[in-house]
């Protein structure tokens, strides 16, 4: 799941499911850990990551919060992958399962458009001139 391009030092919240072989919701067990990988690197971090298994008492629905202000690991102009690095579902390892991705200020922003309308200039009264 793509969580989009985020602002520096933001907090990211998302949920993800786990299911057993018959597709029924199942608990993420085995002292689960969610880690974050930066760019194309093999270094993972758990800084600022909080995992709540079976969120709100709902089996198989898990909540992750990532506080990107928690560590210098989270830097602008980078892409990140969120991965299960420890855990099982029905005694089967789910290590390496990617659950989300995001970036921090790493996407092109077209400053020549306002509300998806190409703009050459904006007047003092707020009028827009189309290109």
Task: Pin down the residues of each PLM region.
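Polar, enzyme-active/binding microenvironments
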Residues: 1-131
């Amino acid at each position: 799941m793509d969580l989009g391009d985020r602002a520096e030092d933001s907090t990211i919240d998302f949920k993800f499911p786990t299911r057993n072989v018959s597709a029924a919701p199942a608990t993420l067990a085995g002292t689960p850990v969610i880690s974050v990988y930066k760019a194309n690197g093999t270094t993972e971090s758990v800084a600022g990551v909080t995992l709540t298994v079976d969120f709100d008492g709902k089996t198989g629905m898990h909540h992750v919060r990532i506080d990107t202000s928690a560590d210098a690991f989270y830097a602008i102009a980078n892409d990140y992958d969120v991965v299960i690095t420890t855990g099982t579902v029905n005694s089967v390892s789910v290590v390496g399962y990617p659950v989300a991705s995001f970036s921090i200020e790493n996407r092109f922003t077209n400053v020549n458009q306002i509300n998806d309308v190409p703009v050459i200039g904006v007047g003092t009264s707020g009028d827009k001139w189309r290109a």
